[in-house]
């Protein structure tokens, strides 16, 4: 974050694209839709789309808070991706480039922590103010299995980095939340947030970077420090595009699309 959000109407279009099985790196995912519907029949009913999203996540309500279920379709899809990733990472860790230190890169929102409850609270209508208010009062739960995968990678000798589009002002909130739900709290050298006021010199695009430029440029910077990024994990195409990773893993997220 910050992130350009889809309107409620576009949410329906994005979810419909996911249902049609758009794929990236071998995993189904939501994509933006450019064509203009010719009639109402081309647009999924928004209530139905939201209900489908809730069913996919196995919506469970406790004390007014919405949680994804560990036996949901979402959790099962994640488990398959994570099992494949662990197998491939285990092989990569045995065949790292000479002299390079192995590393994995994780996005934060809907890759490391789950925004599902927040999205339902705000009607899938992200604003910086509502997001900050949420982070001030609550922690987002870990994405099923990703905390264990990160810990496993660290135990196997890989360094874990996070690259997020969240603003620099949310650094303390992000570190607190990650640590609270099972991740090893990252220091400043291992957690990259978007600093529009003082962008790093290694990003030529500075404050005007697109998400792809910012994230791929930051991965290039990590490589320049002597790391081999053997796995890059994200829930958006823009988390993964631009190279500078040996393998990329697309996690499911039908709630929104970020270019």
Residue ranges with predicted function:
Residues 2-106:
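Non-catalytic pre-domain segments flanking phosphatase-related domains
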Residues 33-44, 72, 171-259:
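C-terminal cap/substrate-recognition subdomain and adjoining C-terminal extension
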Residues 38, 64-76, 132-140, 161-166, ...:
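Second-shell loop/turn segments in exported
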Residues 84, 88-95, 115-119, 149-159, ...:
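Structured segments of extracytoplasmic/periplasmic soluble domains
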Residues 100-115, 162:
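Asp-based phosphoryl-transfer active-site loop
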Residues 110, 146-178, 192-193, 235:
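Substrate-recognition element of Asp-dependent hydrolases with the DxDx(T/V) motif
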Residues 120-137:
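A solvent-exposed, charged loop/short amphipathic helix patch at secondary-structure junctions
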């Amino acid at each position: 974050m910050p992130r350009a959000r889809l309107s409620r109407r576009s949410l329906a279009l994005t979810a419909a694209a996911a249902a049609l099985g758009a794929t990236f790196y071998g995993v189904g995912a939501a994509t933006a839709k450019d064509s203009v519907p010719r009639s109402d029949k081309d647009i999924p009913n928004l209530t139905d789309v939201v209900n489908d999203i809730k069913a996919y996540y196995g919506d469970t309500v406790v004390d007014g808070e919405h949680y994804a279920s560990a036996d949901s379709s979402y959790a099962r899809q994640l488990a398959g991706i994570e099992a494949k990733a662990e197998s491939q990472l285990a092989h990569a860790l045995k065949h790292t480039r000479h002299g390079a230190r192995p590393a994995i890169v994780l996005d934060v929102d809907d890759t490391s922590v789950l925004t599902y409850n927040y999205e339902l609270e705000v009607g899938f209508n992200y604003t910086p103010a509502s997001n900050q208010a949420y982070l001030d009062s609550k922690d987002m739960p870990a994405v099923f299995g990703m905390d264990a995968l990160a810990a496993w990678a660290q135990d196997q000798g890989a360094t874990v980095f996070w690259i997020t589009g969240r603003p620099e002002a949310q650094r303390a909130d992000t570190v607190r939340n990650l640590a609270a739900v099972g991740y090893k709290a990252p220091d400043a050298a291992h957690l990259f947030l978007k600093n529009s006021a003082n962008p790093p010199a290694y990003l030529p695009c500075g404050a005007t970077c697109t998400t792809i430029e910012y994230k791929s440029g930051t991965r290039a910077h990590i490589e320049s420090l002597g790391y081999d990024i053997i796995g890059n994990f994200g829930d958006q195409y823009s988390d993964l595009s631009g190279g500078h990773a040996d393998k990329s893993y697309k996690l499911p997220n039908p709630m929104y699309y970020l270019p």
